[in-house]
Amino acid sequence: MRREVAVRGMGRVELAAYGVADAEHQVERELRECWPGARVELLEVARTLPEPRIVEEFAVRYRLRGTVAVEAEREEDARRAAFRALRERFAGTRHARIAWEAEG
């Protein structure tokens, strides 16, 4: 049986960028490449080093929301399958450590 599972995930990454806007753009682009239909919300963008540089280090916290379609008989199995599918999508990226949970 095909089921739609609503999920949300939160993560934090550190990256080098030319400014706040570049850091935001990089994170949003990378997340949308892994999960095109997700809603991306950037929660916090902060410089990790106090002194200014041409290329700065940033820490970005974000939240993702969306639905994942899976094949499963039970709701509990559908949630597990959705989390597994998301972990596979983000494996090998700097976003591989997102904490996932079911919504609703």
Task: Locate each region found by the language model.
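Long, contiguous binding/interaction regions
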Residues: 1-61, 65-67, 71-104
